[in-house]
Amino acid sequence: MKTYSAKPSEIEKKWWVIDAKNIVLGRLASRVANMLRGKHKPSFTPHLDCGDNIIIINAEHVNLTGKKANPKDGKIYYRYTGFPGGIKDTTAGKILSGKHPERVIKMAVKRMITRNALGAKQMSNLYVYANGDHPHMAQQPTVYDFASQNPKNKK
């Protein structure tokens, strides 16, 4: 029996919608990263974008375990401006309570995806919204009940 390798014309992408309300961030991000890569499908091919399109709603209500949500000494995200002494930091709690809470989920998933051109293409199939509304009803997304798969997924 030969090893199956999918062709780009054979790939079928589904649309999924996941409600992130009270879901643990790391567990959600790892599952979404696998779905974006297509590793949940038997037709997974490493060099092709065979993953699905994922819509995440209620990103502002995602949960962080332990002390990571603490605004003072929680999980710290660093960025560099490119100038000497230009390292900036912010915490996950500040981002979640700020203007763009969906960035916490996007950063968590992005850091679990391969860092190359294919990973960037797969990340373009992720749509994260802070509240419960999304403009993708025309694609008829299937609801993915992540919370009921494992009691540890919900906090």
From Swiss-Prot:
Alphabetized Pfam families for the sequence: Ribosomal_L13
Q: Which GO terms describe its cellular component?
A: cytosolic large ribosomal subunit
Coiled coil where?
none
- Keyword terms, alphabetized: Ribonucleoprotein, Ribosomal protein
- Mark the transmembrane ranges: none
PROSITE patterns referenced in this protein's UniProt entry, alphabetically: RIBOSOMAL_L13
Which top-rank group of organisms is this from?
Answer: Bacteria
Q: Which HAMAP family did the record assign? A: Ribosomal_uL13 (MF_01366)
Q: What does this gene product do? A: This protein is one of the early assembly proteins of the 50S ribosomal subunit, although it is not seen to bind rRNA by itself. It is important during the early stages of 50S assembly.
> Matching PANTHER family, A to Z?
LARGE RIBOSOMAL SUBUNIT PROTEIN UL13M, RIBOSOMAL PROTEIN L13
What family is this protein classified in? Answer: Belongs to the universal ribosomal protein uL13 family.
Subunit structure comment from the entry: Part of the 50S ribosomal subunit.
The protein here is known as Large ribosomal subunit protein uL13
Source organism: Rickettsia rickettsii (strain Sheila Smith)
